[in-house]
Swiss-Prot record:
One Gene Ontology molecular-function label: galactoside O-acetyltransferase activity
Keywords for the protein's UniProt record, in alphabetical order: Acyltransferase, Cytoplasm, Lactose biosynthesis, Repeat, Transferase
Name of the protein: Galactoside O-acetyltransferase
Annotated active site: H115
Binding site for substrate: D17, S71, N85, D93
PANTHER family xref list: ACETYLTRANSFERASE YJL218W-RELATED, GALACTOSIDE O-ACETYLTRANSFERASE
Top-rank EC class of the record's enzyme: transferase
Organism (species): Escherichia coli (strain K12)
Catalysed transformations (reactions): a beta-D-galactoside + acetyl-CoA = a 6-acetyl-beta-D-galactoside + CoA
Length: 203
């Protein structure tokens, strides 16, 4: 018996996405996405409502700056106090989980999906998906790309322009192409917010 596409996705097997109701699910998500991206800046309540409708789960005080782009939206889980700047792109053929207090800078891409390297294995659009998990208190810099199957640990910072191909542990600063750990986050970081600029008082 052939395995349904949704089961193939969960099992990490190759799949195609033009059957079994998947196009209809994408259309629903992209219709909401279109409405959100074309809303007026003054329509704050409308945007708040659409954020809750576009994504699978959304915590309190979550905000996304338009435009935002995704495949379905219904596979994206967002925690509390989330903020994403403009041009966030999420390829969510499978689950994307974002923790609490996460900040995402402009032009970031999270993609759970890739294609086989050999051309014969992707001639019909075959692809694979592995979930992405972003921990709590993570800050992702601008123009970062996060590849399929990656987990970023709690409290970590991903430097601008990084391509993240492997898991990043908690409590580190990581950057580069490919992304690698630069250093651990330490007590000095509690007192200096940028280079030698010292924190004088709470904002």
């Amino acid at each position: 018996m052939n395995m349904p596409m949704t089961e193939r996705i969960r099992a990490g097997k190759l799949f195609t996405d033009m059957c079994e109701g998947l196009p209809e699910k994408r259309l629903r998500g992209k219709t909401l996405m279109y409405e959100f991206n074309h809303s007026h800046p003054s329509e704050v309540e409308k945007r708040e409502s659409l954020i809750k409708e576009m994504f699978a789960t959304v915590g309190e005080n979550a905000w996304v700056e338009p435009p935002v782009y995704f495949s379905y939206g219904s596979n994206i889980h967002i925690g509390r106090n989330f903020y994403a700047n403009f041009n966030l792109t999420i390829v969510d053929d499978y689950t994307v989980t974002i923790g609490d207090n996460v900040l995402i800078a402009p032009n970031v891409t999270l993609s759970v999906t890739g294609h086989p390297v050999h051309h014969e294995l992707r001639k019909n659009g075959e692809m694979y998906s592995f979930p992405i998990t972003i921990g709590n208190n993570v800050w992702i810099g601008s123009h970062v790309v996060i590849n399929p199957g990656v987990t970023i640990g709690d409290n970590s910072v991903i430097g601008a322009g990084s391509i993240v191909t492997k898991d990043i542990p908690p409590n580190v600063v990581a950057a580069g192409v490919p992304c690698r750990v630069i250093r651990e986050i330490n007590d000095r970081d509690k007192h200096y917010y940028f280079k030698d600029y010292k924190v004088e008082s709470s904002v």
